Amino acid sequence: ADAATMEALKKDGRLLAYREAKVDGLAPGSYDTDHTYFGSKLITTGIAVNTAAKSRPASWADLAKPEYKGQIAMPSPLYSGAAAIMLGTMTTRSDLGWKFFEQLKASDAVAVRGNGAVLNAVANGEKSYGVLVDFMAFNAKAKGSPIDFVFPAEGLPAVTEPVAILKTAQNPAAARAFVDFILSDDGQKLASSMGYIPARASAGMPSWYPAGAKIHLMPTNIAQVVQSNAANLKRFAELFGN
């Protein structure tokens, strides 16, 4: 589940708050300030680049330049929760907004069913650039795919795959213990060992993480994303189709 799903469950009054959860050291914005759900990891979205590409973008805005025309694939938010959060995050920014997506459409970018389809398109050279989640790009690169990954200058939207406790939980104490483990250094090191960026930086980065790289996360107002999601998906479908 993603934070948007958790926000909807919270709105419906189905989540049990866990005020004592240890959130010190967690990435800002990775957990609900009312302590009803907590991010287990960070999965960021950036730009995958085929190593044979002639140009290398440094920012999201670069993708709207003429040299990238017809060479971009991205996951459709109609099928990808991470893409829906990306859309809801980017369209609220003054430096990107809907203008960015309109520019992508004018540049003949295509929206495909999900991140897997984006990865395949970039890896096989069908497209030179793809909007893609981090670990998929780096895992493919480690297996020999001709892919690099760019952390765009404006920042990266992220999903957090939160953990939460339902009010109907039959064993709330065990549920709290599970949350404690997920948020602990040991739990976060487990996420890192599985190839994900931990929500707690002290747990250490996954093996694929570039030495010296710094990730700037785009702030996301999840409640606003949920509220605007239906309208956003409708507008996106009008631009890129279903």
Q: Which residues does each PLM region occupy?
A:
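A ligand-binding cleft/hinge motif common to bilobed small-molecule-binding domains
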Residues: 4-8, 128-146
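Short amphipathic alpha-helical coupling segments at ligand-binding clamshell hinges
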Residues: 59, 100, 161, 170-182, ...
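A bilobed periplasmic-binding-protein/Venus flytrap-type ligand-binding module shared by bacterial periplasmic
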Residues: 46-53, 88, 160-171, 190-191
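Periplasmic-binding protein-like
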Residues: 28-29, 43-44, 70-78, 102-105, 111-112, 181-205, ...
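An extracytoplasmic/periplasmic, membrane-proximal ligand-sensing/linker region
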Residues: 99, 199-242
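Extracytoplasmic ligand-binding site segments that recognize negatively charged/polar headgroups
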Residues: 1-126
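Short beta-strand->loop
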Residues: 16-23, 36-39, 61, 129, ...
